[in-house]
């Protein structure tokens, strides 16, 4: 985060490795959850239906029960992790929690925010659906998550194989995410590649990597694989890859 702040201030910041100072007996690690969207296909299969802001201002999950009622509780990672940290506050370093990554094709956080839900055709078939309210509620929850210590990230718009699709599809997907999702979460500089499909091989990114440069142009600085290990970290002058 300091990178962009210093850059806007006219400085010339660079990424560099530093020692991680932790209390004795503690281990640094990155926790992430991708696809925090509660897709339509998950309805009725025992998953939470969406994340809402609870009465205490903290994010919590809703779940549709078999009888049609709505139950509010710890039905997914976010509220479960929050409860654990309340009992074990030393688990979290300076309030840091998990990285949550979103696609966009079905919306985010259980809210139907994709552009397709705002079309006249969809509205005609769902007259009680309020597209603008869905987006407003998603943005409210996203802010609550950030206030609660979570980092928000991209998981591509269409859950695409970002290392294999054509450059044309790559640009289209990235632009859709930038248009439909980024404004709801306040932007991000983190991307978690779907399927662990990176945009290069194991060697460091090169300046002539067209996909790398395009993602950087959209503000991304942290490039992560969902199946990475703690030993795989590459730090460039203006980005980190893990």
Language model regions located:
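Alpha-helix initiation and capping sites
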Residues: 132-135, 139, 156, 164-167, ...
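Residue-level signal for short, function-critical loop segments
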Residues: 104, 158, 194-197
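Active-site beta->alpha N-cap acidic-glycine motif
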Residues: 1-144, 148, 199
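C-terminal active-site subregion of NodB/CE4 polysaccharide deacetylases
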Residues: 1, 6, 11-32, 38-43, ...
